[in-house]
């Protein structure tokens, strides 16, 4: 990852880390902070959980929980090392560009899969919107509501979803191309 691509990838990863943390009952800002410290120390061989604790003031149990989560998702990797003054083994955490690229590719494929499902669903269904408040309902929902908005009482109108579907299809095509480029870069022989 170089230049603008690196910055975009780091921002995407930070968003992903925050969502992962939140889904696992961890404070998103804490996980993002740990991620950024690891990212900054990766060129220096990584950072230990002891160093993360002294730099952040976070409890070691919280730090290790975040490290385990990021490690399980292959965002970070560890290596064993010796503590300079103790006989204890330390683990140094760093971002490995190979595993992170594969993780990002996997994430993109999951997003693509969801978009394809949405496109299939949206192309096979009609929607109704409220011209006053903008609420959107499927045909079945609108039928149940007698084509009247439950929020404001306005008559629902059939939505023209062609433009939205076209935009969704362009997004799907662009993501497929990006995935193909990433796969050729990651798996080239």
Swiss-Prot record:
GO terms for biological process: regulation of DNA-templated transcription; transcription initiation at RNA polymerase II promoter. Residues 9-101 form the HTH TFE/IIEalpha-type domain. One of its GO terms (molecular function) is DNA binding. Signal peptide: none annotated. InterPro entries: TF_E_archaea, TFE, TFIIE/TFIIEa_HTH, TFIIE_asu, TFIIEa/SarR/Rpc3_HTH_dom, WH-like_DNA-bd_sf, WH_DNA-bd_sf, Znf_TFIIB. It comes from the Archaea. PROSITE patterns: HTH_TFE_IIE (PS51344). Keywords: DNA-binding, Transcription, Transcription regulation. Transcription factor that plays a role in the activation of archaeal genes transcribed by RNA polymerase. Facilitates transcription initiation by enhancing TATA-box recognition by TATA-box-binding protein (Tbp), and transcription factor B (Tfb) and RNA polymerase recruitment. Not absolutely required for transcription in vitro, but particularly important in cases where Tbp or Tfb function is not optimal. It dynamically alters the nucleic acid-binding properties of RNA polymerases by stabilizing the initiation complex and destabilizing elongation complexes. Belongs to the TFE family. The winged helix domain is involved in binding to DNA in the preinitiation complex. Monomer. Interaction with RNA polymerase subunits RpoF and RpoE is necessary for Tfe stimulatory transcription activity. Able to interact with Tbp and RNA polymerase in the absence of DNA promoter. Interacts both with the preinitiation and elongation complexes. This is Transcription factor E. It comes from Aeropyrum pernix (strain ATCC 700893 / DSM 11879 / JCM 9820 / NBRC 100138 / K1).
